[in-house]
Amino acid sequence: QIMLQPAATSNGLLLLERAETDAPAPFDWHNATVYFVLTDRFENGDPSNDQSYERHKDGMAEIGTFHGGDLRGLINKLDYLQQLGVNALWISAPFEQIHGWVGGGTKGDFPHYAYHGYYTQDWTNLDANMGNEADLRTLVDSAHQRGIRILFDVVMNHTGYATLADMQEYQFGALYLSGDEVKKTLGERWSDWKPAAGQTWHSFNDYINFSDKTGWDKWWGKNWIRTDIGDYDNPGFDDL
């Protein structure tokens, strides 16, 4: 006979488990345990890439700035995710995003960077804030060793906005400013611009001439297609 007695601190609860466990069932997407990660806000594994492309903090609430999470941070947390029973890791789009910021919120009260991966600029490159191709390969290989699949979020609905930083870096688009007005208004580095009294972070758009076709040819090119989304109201005009 074997006598089993609950521990004094278990409130009378006694748990029995099999010594031998069944082999894990084959992976099936219908029964996958998917964990979604907004990579930038998850784990900072490499602080050296936190301010790639001269991105910087706003010195306020940091609502729309990059916080440092990256692919190396995901690698560091794979054991934790495995312990949770995760077998599919869905990560925010790691593609290269617009380098600069746009106005954040309906009131434009903060600068908004593409930390979420929604404003892709180059679908063929990784964003430097996320890491490099070696980091991505290590993440995928290390995840597979733990039985975890890696999924990319792919945001095809829209691409990146025009920002002052990208316009200056890639020399596309057109401004309503000219000559000395440019440096006087936007500064040496356009991405350092901040709203003055009576302005918001949306106000940088007031300096951009979106109707200058010649200035935007380098950005859009000749072979692009635009299509609207079903069930969205058509405003009756084209912002492009």
PLM features per residue range, with description:
Residues 1-20:
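Extended acidic/polar, glycine-enriched regions
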